[in-house]
Amino acid sequence: MKNILIILLLVVNLSMVISQPITAKEKDFISLAYVSLSMLNMHKLEASEVKPLLDKYNWNGISDVALINGVFMTGKDGSIITSWNRDEWPAVFDGIDYKGDSIDEQKQREMLCSKKVVKEVVKYFKKKGIDIWLSQTPYCWLTGGSLGAVLEDHEKTMLYAHRLNRFARKFGCVGLDFDFEFPPTERQAQGYRELMQESKRLGMKVSVCAIQPTVDKSYQDNCFPDDAAVNSHEGKYMKWEKIVGEGIVDNINVMQYLAYNSQLKRMDVNVKYEKMSIWEKAYPEEFTSSRKVNMLCGIGYYSFMLPEAKVGKNIRGKGTLNFNQLYEKYGQAAYTDGLVGGEHAVWTTDDVRDIVRTAKAKGWKGVFTWLVTHDFTLEHPLKYNRQQALAEEVENIWKDK
């Protein structure tokens, strides 16, 4: 009888430990990296192959990672879909994406990693002392897909919030990152805020991705000239003033990754700073010690395809390339030249250093990078590596504290 009581107490204590949120380390300056498990093809790996793969990447100067894609998906019934509960999967959402193509949620489901692989990923970063966030995505901008169906139902949203938070805690995540910057309707945006607010109430750290506090025609014309309409929903429905004013989230990750100067035909840090200043002017208190929300500045580790390289809707080159591809094609010029091959604009390592220093000076709480798969590789010389440049600047900030 005594042994049975001991076992019951252990089970109760274990369940309490599992249900408790993991406490994130307080940081003077955050450096977060988005890690897409599916883009790293981890769904094809065995658990024993995880560490050798991640060891190929440069994790210097990183305090947090957000695991995006490949861990879980949202079921339209409010369930958590994983590779290990395949027998419980609900039907996929049937709809059209923003390009007019059929939503292919099934393809994404087939790229979910095994539980053993996910556990190895978590163990890898924990051993490095890196905090882990779990990213919630809709898998379809401007329709929401299955997530959109959940967000349109309040009771389902609350149920899903509890499931999502419990799931994240089981893997030792400190927070949830919400990467659905374009809710297509006011109702879905409301549900999205409810999901974030409930997640924070349940004790998790919460971050949300953003581009602009407001969206106007000038922004659309200058940000993504060919796909301006894709960005028109965010400022219309997200209600950033409510999110900031009520402290619904802990971090806002501002995804102004690139800043193209059409006159210079290259990336321009001054254009980047103009974009950053829109947030600084809209919410000046959030860039002081009195902030309710931490503002993180995004840096894109990929190329911008020059408009001049396009003929109508046809692209003469290969389109936007990641840095592995650029380095293979152009060598060190891909890292030192602002304009590569007459068709790709990129940040140089000097640009990255300048952005990190300026973000800190202007009161941004940190920086984040999109995306691990591109410029984190250790295959290239570190002096040409953007992540190494960022790491050195971030580590200098940490040392000064």
Where do the language-model regions lie?
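Bacterial Sec-dependent N-terminal signal peptides
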Residues: 1-24
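Chitinase-like catalytic core of GlcNAc-active glycosidases
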Residues: 22-274, 279, 291-298, 305-352, ...
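Histidine-acidic metal/acid-base catalytic patches
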Residues: 357
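Conserved catalytic region of serine esterases and O-acyltransferases that act on ester linkages
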Residues: 401
